[in-house]
């Protein structure tokens, strides 16, 4: 019966991750310590799928196990389709240096050069970096007489990070079925058009953040926690916005539009009784 329908679908996703780095550790006389790291990271994602549907099976139970038994495949009327995702690649090289002196003064700096295939060639690469500094006041000589303070540290940090969180297909010139109509001879005709407005000027969303904080531990570790005050600003926000038709084919497009700022404070308090 033509009502006996069998379908089979196969989807395959492949993720490739590769990372490599080396670390240099050195302790110098006088309490100086250096920890340096340099390396790379690579990520790639690919996906593809296949779908098949056949009809007119003689036995209901056989349709999922032997798609050849449906007569529509032999008659050339079975439905088959395949799909392939847009490849997504992310590559970066990075370096980081940490320095400390007698566990009292700390500083660190990092930089990351990162490229994403989601963006056009002119906007693909960007640099992201951060610097931090800290002072463990509790290890100073003038704090030794205050026996109820076990740890008191002040720290400051500033950094720039990037975001490319959108589907890779948004930067591909994809075509899709737009309209279809029947010709006088009874044959269906199809037209194809763009399914999205590619934006060659799209670039990384960037977040700039600075933080001032305090870590503490009092009364032999029975009271501990931290306090942070932060300010954040996000530039070149990635957002899908409405665009006019014409000149655009579709009514929306991903753009870098606007900025967002926030500030606030956070704290944690813990205790052991």
In which residue ranges do the predicted regions lie?
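Extracellular/periplasmic, surface-exposed regions of secreted and cell-surface proteins
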Residues: 1, 7-8, 12-273
